[in-house]
Amino acid sequence: MRHIFIALALSVGLSAGLAVPVAAKDADQKAIEAIITDQIAAFQADDFARAFSFASPTIKGLFGTPQNFGAMVQRGYPMVYRPNSVRILELREVDGRLWQRVMVTDPAGATHLLDYQVIETPEGWQINAVQLLPQSGVGA
């Protein structure tokens, strides 16, 4: 399932485009940060239904149920499921899509960078993809 999630992230063109920092409206920036941190908090509470509520219709369609989604995150993204710390970094635009970079430290002290693609829907901002970035000495 992790491969599906990463494939989705790659299919939207992250690797093909040029990343440009975004000067998002303050309200949008705060809302984007909130959906990511709120989803992580829901995972920490094992509230998969709440975590699933932050996912886009595309992600909901891929996984079908909060339980399937939660199981995928537990197996494929353990650093998101049980982080030691979370730091929101820059918001960027790549090929017209918004990507929020997040730095997560896992319980063992390893640092991970993730890119969250977010989309605006009638329900507000939602997470449409997450890509775990390759390790490159982050935090060293």
Question: Which residue ranges define each predicted feature?
Answer:
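Alpha-helical transmembrane segments and their juxtamembrane interfaces
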Residues: 12-13, 57, 125
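Short, low-complexity N-terminal intrinsically disordered segments enriched in polar/charged residues
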Residues: 19-45
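Short solvent-exposed beta->alpha transition segments
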Residues: 30-34, 38, 48-95
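Positively charged n-region of N-terminal signal peptides that target proteins for export
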Residues: 1-7
